[in-house]
Amino acid sequence: MSDTMQSLDQLSALKTAAPDAPKREKKVDKQGRAYATGKRKDAVARVWIKPGSGKIVVNTRDVEVYFARPVLRMLIQQPIVAAARQGQYDVVATVAGGGLSGQAGAVRHGISKALTHFEPDLRGVLKKGGFLTRDSRVVERKKYGKAKARRSFQFSKR
Protein backbone atom coordinates (compact mmCIF):
# COMPACT_ATOMS: atom_id res chain seq x y z
CA MET A 1 0.00 0.00 0.00
CA SER A 2 2.80 2.39 0.85
CA ASP A 3 4.30 1.67 -2.58
CA THR A 4 1.22 3.03 -4.38
CA MET A 5 1.03 6.07 -2.13
CA GLN A 6 4.63 6.83 -2.89
CA SER A 7 3.98 6.62 -6.64
CA LEU A 8 0.85 8.80 -6.37
CA ASP A 9 2.84 11.41 -4.47
CA GLN A 10 5.43 11.31 -7.21
CA LEU A 11 2.67 11.70 -9.80
CA SER A 12 1.27 14.81 -8.10
CA ALA A 13 4.78 16.23 -7.89
CA LEU A 14 5.19 15.68 -11.62
CA LYS A 15 1.90 17.47 -12.35
CA THR A 16 2.93 20.56 -10.41
CA ALA A 17 6.31 20.66 -12.16
CA ALA A 18 4.77 20.58 -15.66
CA PRO A 19 6.05 23.42 -17.88
CA ASP A 20 3.69 26.24 -18.78
CA ALA A 21 2.49 26.75 -22.34
CA PRO A 22 4.92 28.78 -24.45
CA LYS A 23 4.29 32.52 -24.47
CA ARG A 24 2.75 33.89 -27.64
CA GLU A 25 5.00 36.15 -29.66
CA LYS A 26 4.21 39.54 -31.14
CA LYS A 27 3.50 39.27 -34.90
CA VAL A 28 4.39 42.58 -36.56
CA ASP A 29 5.57 43.37 -40.12
CA LYS A 30 8.46 45.64 -41.17
CA GLN A 31 6.32 48.79 -40.92
CA GLY A 32 5.35 47.93 -37.33
CA ARG A 33 1.80 46.87 -38.23
CA ALA A 34 -0.14 43.82 -37.10
CA TYR A 35 -2.29 42.16 -39.79
CA ALA A 36 -5.36 39.96 -39.45
CA THR A 37 -8.41 38.91 -41.44
CA GLY A 38 -11.92 38.95 -40.04
CA LYS A 39 -15.03 37.29 -41.42
CA ARG A 40 -18.77 37.62 -40.82
CA LYS A 41 -21.55 36.30 -43.08
CA ASP A 42 -20.31 36.99 -46.64
CA ALA A 43 -17.96 39.83 -45.67
CA VAL A 44 -14.18 39.47 -45.45
CA ALA A 45 -12.08 42.23 -43.86
CA ARG A 46 -8.32 42.67 -44.03
CA VAL A 47 -7.19 44.74 -41.05
CA TRP A 48 -3.87 46.40 -40.21
CA ILE A 49 -3.28 48.13 -36.87
CA LYS A 50 -0.32 50.22 -35.74
CA PRO A 51 0.33 52.53 -32.78
CA GLY A 52 -1.25 55.92 -33.39
CA SER A 53 -4.00 58.32 -32.45
CA GLY A 54 -7.05 56.05 -32.75
CA LYS A 55 -8.05 56.85 -36.33
CA ILE A 56 -10.08 54.16 -38.13
CA VAL A 57 -10.14 54.05 -41.95
CA VAL A 58 -12.33 51.58 -43.86
CA ASN A 59 -11.87 51.23 -47.64
CA THR A 60 -9.91 54.54 -47.77
CA ARG A 61 -12.81 56.38 -46.10
CA ASP A 62 -13.21 57.52 -42.52
CA VAL A 63 -15.28 55.18 -40.34
CA GLU A 64 -17.94 57.90 -39.77
CA VAL A 65 -18.44 58.17 -43.53
CA TYR A 66 -18.36 54.46 -44.38
CA PHE A 67 -20.51 53.28 -41.46
CA ALA A 68 -23.06 56.06 -41.04
CA ARG A 69 -25.13 54.20 -38.42
CA PRO A 70 -23.80 54.75 -34.87
CA VAL A 71 -24.58 51.13 -33.93
CA LEU A 72 -22.13 49.84 -36.55
CA ARG A 73 -19.40 52.26 -35.41
CA MET A 74 -19.95 51.15 -31.81
CA LEU A 75 -19.69 47.50 -32.93
CA ILE A 76 -16.29 48.18 -34.52
CA GLN A 77 -15.02 49.97 -31.38
CA GLN A 78 -16.02 47.16 -28.99
CA PRO A 79 -12.75 45.16 -28.99
CA ILE A 80 -10.67 48.34 -28.56
CA VAL A 81 -12.87 49.49 -25.66
CA ALA A 82 -12.83 46.01 -24.05
CA ALA A 83 -9.03 46.00 -24.19
CA ALA A 84 -8.93 49.60 -22.83
CA ARG A 85 -6.85 50.79 -25.80
CA GLN A 86 -8.94 53.76 -27.02
CA GLY A 87 -6.87 56.27 -28.96
CA GLN A 88 -3.75 54.08 -28.98
CA TYR A 89 -3.99 52.32 -32.35
CA ASP A 90 -4.69 53.44 -35.91
CA VAL A 91 -6.77 50.94 -37.87
CA VAL A 92 -6.76 50.54 -41.66
CA ALA A 93 -9.25 48.03 -43.05
CA THR A 94 -10.34 46.88 -46.49
CA VAL A 95 -13.60 44.99 -46.50
CA ALA A 96 -15.52 43.33 -49.34
CA GLY A 97 -18.69 41.29 -49.68
CA GLY A 98 -21.94 41.21 -47.77
CA GLY A 99 -23.88 44.15 -46.40
CA LEU A 100 -22.96 46.86 -43.93
CA SER A 101 -23.79 44.81 -40.83
CA GLY A 102 -21.70 41.85 -41.98
CA GLN A 103 -18.85 44.16 -42.98
CA ALA A 104 -18.88 45.84 -39.55
CA GLY A 105 -18.77 42.42 -37.89
CA ALA A 106 -15.88 41.36 -40.13
CA VAL A 107 -13.89 44.51 -39.28
CA ARG A 108 -14.58 43.92 -35.58
CA HIS A 109 -13.32 40.33 -35.84
CA GLY A 110 -10.22 41.49 -37.73
CA ILE A 111 -9.43 44.23 -35.20
CA SER A 112 -9.70 41.69 -32.37
CA LYS A 113 -7.32 39.26 -34.05
CA ALA A 114 -4.86 42.03 -34.97
CA LEU A 115 -4.85 43.29 -31.36
CA THR A 116 -3.86 39.81 -30.17
CA HIS A 117 -1.05 39.75 -32.75
CA PHE A 118 0.18 43.11 -31.47
CA GLU A 119 -0.34 42.43 -27.75
CA PRO A 120 -0.63 38.68 -27.03
CA ASP A 121 -1.53 39.43 -23.39
CA LEU A 122 -4.92 40.81 -24.52
CA ARG A 123 -6.00 37.39 -25.81
CA GLY A 124 -7.73 36.41 -22.54
CA VAL A 125 -9.74 39.63 -22.32
CA LEU A 126 -10.84 39.49 -25.96
CA LYS A 127 -11.61 35.76 -25.80
CA LYS A 128 -13.74 36.28 -22.70
CA GLY A 129 -15.67 39.02 -24.51
CA GLY A 130 -16.27 36.69 -27.46
CA PHE A 131 -14.45 38.90 -29.97
CA LEU A 132 -12.06 36.22 -31.25
CA THR A 133 -14.78 33.69 -32.07
CA ARG A 134 -15.83 33.57 -35.72
CA ASP A 135 -19.62 33.97 -35.92
CA SER A 136 -20.43 31.05 -38.22
CA ARG A 137 -24.09 31.94 -38.79
CA VAL A 138 -24.80 32.39 -42.49
CA VAL A 139 -27.99 32.74 -44.51
CA GLU A 140 -29.86 29.47 -44.91
CA ARG A 141 -30.25 28.41 -48.52
CA LYS A 142 -33.57 28.48 -50.34
CA LYS A 143 -35.15 25.08 -50.88
CA TYR A 144 -37.14 24.07 -53.95
CA GLY A 145 -40.88 23.73 -53.33
CA LYS A 146 -40.69 26.61 -50.85
CA ALA A 147 -41.01 30.37 -51.21
CA LYS A 148 -37.88 31.00 -49.12
CA ALA A 149 -35.63 28.85 -46.96
CA ARG A 150 -38.49 27.72 -44.70
CA ARG A 151 -41.57 29.69 -45.72
CA SER A 152 -44.05 27.65 -47.73
CA PHE A 153 -46.15 29.00 -50.54
CA GLN A 154 -49.61 30.22 -49.54
CA PHE A 155 -52.00 27.32 -49.06
CA SER A 156 -55.66 27.49 -50.10
CA LYS A 157 -58.12 24.84 -48.95
CA ARG A 158 -60.66 25.61 -51.71
From Swiss-Prot:
Disulphide-bridged cysteine pairs: none
UniProt keyword annotations, A-Z: Ribonucleoprotein, Ribosomal protein
Pfam family, one: Ribosomal_S9
Biased composition (Polar residues): 1-10
Ranges of compositional bias, category Basic and acidic residues: 21-32
Keyword Ribosomal protein: yes
Example of a GO MF term: RNA binding
Biological process annotations from GO: translation
Region Disordered, annotated ranges: 1-35
Gene Ontology cellular-component terms listed: cytosolic small ribosomal subunit
UniProt cross-references to InterPro entries, sorted A to Z: Ribosomal_Su5_D2-typ_SF (IPR020568), Ribosomal_uS9 (IPR000754), Ribosomal_uS9_bac/plastid (IPR023035), Ribosomal_uS9_CS (IPR020574), Ribsml_uS5_D2-typ_fold_subgr (IPR014721)
Family per record: Belongs to the universal ribosomal protein uS9 family.
Name this polypeptide is given: Small ribosomal subunit protein uS9
Source organism per UniProt: Afipia carboxidovorans (strain ATCC 49405 / DSM 1227 / KCTC 32145 / OM5)
Gene from which the chain derives: rpsI
